[in-house]
């Protein structure tokens, strides 16, 4: 679907990487632009090489000297030959390097430039450093998490703000590419992760203003709960009444039907489910619409045999960028030659000065 679309990824760590992975899975040629001698910090973090490989499969890597005239010249030629640029710096960083949207669109008016930021460049927090946990905390979603034994909100096991920002950015990029077909012009996009996660709980804010409590989807309902069984856990998400009635029928307690939202029923359901194994309950619910599934470990998911990793189906196919993740600068020569740089220009743009390698 995106064959022929070239994406330059200047970002680091998770948000930009997952955004451009989604685009790569749809056929885009994603070029990770890294600083010569350094590369993405993820490469050097504990477990980083494994995570880097998962996030950058099928992409290409170019290593350049960002802070030199030769490096800038190479970047301008890359931009002139590309469709999309993704970056994840704090507002103003790319501009200080002479690589902001206003600088680059002079070399490519059709460029779609997407900045994935922590906080809006137009807001009071624009210069504040932050990561996923900070955005979840300030925007409100962290306060909605279940509490730990110490009384603190539980930290989600996945980086929800990072991934939400990535998906939102990919959606915005696709919309801008569609718009470009009609206008022949690109545009600058900004995706502040703080704003993304706050938008997820708009209905909670509406309820708070109206003093209306919404559904407790954090384990306070018997119909939406994680139950312990003999050898693991079983998830029940029977929010709609027909699903809940089916659930009650399978466990042999149709009398619990009227108590779908009665928290006192949780212990009764738990006592029924606990003696049997997870597989026994899976077999009992087979073919019954009750929204009941086992809670699988990562190892069990890998062994399950269900195709993984491609969030979009195209007429039954699972598009997926193929090939291993690139080593630092692995495709520099090839990509820069494709963009028309001479051997001398390539050499000048790629040699890492001692102060840049530190």
Regions inferred by a protein language model and the residue ranges of each:
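Glycine-rich beta-alpha junction loops
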Residues: 37, 118-120, 193-198, 231, ...
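Short linear loop/turn motifs
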Residues: 257-271, 295-304, 344-358
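Substrate-binding/catalytic subdomain of NAD(P)-dependent oxidoreductase enzymes
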Residues: 177-214
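Active-site-adjacent capping/gating segments
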Residues: 43-53, 214, 295-335
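N-terminal helix-loop segment corresponding to the beta1-alpha1 unit
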Residues: 1-185, 327, 333-358
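Aromatic-enriched alpha-helical interface/lid elements that frame and gate functional surfaces
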Residues: 211, 218-288, 292
């Amino acid at each position: 679907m995106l064959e022929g679309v070239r994406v330059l990824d200047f970002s680091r760590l998770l948000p930009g990487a997952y955004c451009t992975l989604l685009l790569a899975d749809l056929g885009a040629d994603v070029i990770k632009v890294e600083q010569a001698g350094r590369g993405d910090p993820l490469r050097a973090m504990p477990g980083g090489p494994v995570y880097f490989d998962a996030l950058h499969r099928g992409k290409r890597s170019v290593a350049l000297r960002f802070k030199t005239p030769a490096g800038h010249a190479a970047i301008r030629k890359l931009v002139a030959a590309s469709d999309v640029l993704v970056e994840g710096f704090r507002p103003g960083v790319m501009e200080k390097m002479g690589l902001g949207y206003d600088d680059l669109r002079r070399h490519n008016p059709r460029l779609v430039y997407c900045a994935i930021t922590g906080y809006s460049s137009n807001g009071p927090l624009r210069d504040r450093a932050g990561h996923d946990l900070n955005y979840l905390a300030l925007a409100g979603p962290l306060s909605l998490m279940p509490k730990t034994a110490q009384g603190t909100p539980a930290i989600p096991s996945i980086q929800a703000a990072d991934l939400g920002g990535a998906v939102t950015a990919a959606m915005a990029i696709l919309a801008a590419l569609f718009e470009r077909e009609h206008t022949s012009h690109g545009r600058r996009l900004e995706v502040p992760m703080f704003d993304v996660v706050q938008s997820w709980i708009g209905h909670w804010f509406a309820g708070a203003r109206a003093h209306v409590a919404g559904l407790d989807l954090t384990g306070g309902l018997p119909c939406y709960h994680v139950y312990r069984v003999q050898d693991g856990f079983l998830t029940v998400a029977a929010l709609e009444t027909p699903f809940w009635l089916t659930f009650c029928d399978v466990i042999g307690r149709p009398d619990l039907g009227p108590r779908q939202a009665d928290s006192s029923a949780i212990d009764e359901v738990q006592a029924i489910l606990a003696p049997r194994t997870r597989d026994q309950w899976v077999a009992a619910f087979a073919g019954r619409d009750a929204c009941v599934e086992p809670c699988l470990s990562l190892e069990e998911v890998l062994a399950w045999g269900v195709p993984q990793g491609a969030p979009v189906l195209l007429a039954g196919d699972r598009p997926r960028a193929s090939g291993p993740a690139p080593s630092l600068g692995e495709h520099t020569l090839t990509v820069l030659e494709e963009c028309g740089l001479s051997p001398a220009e390539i050499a000048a743009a790629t040699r890492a000065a001692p102060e840049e390698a530190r």
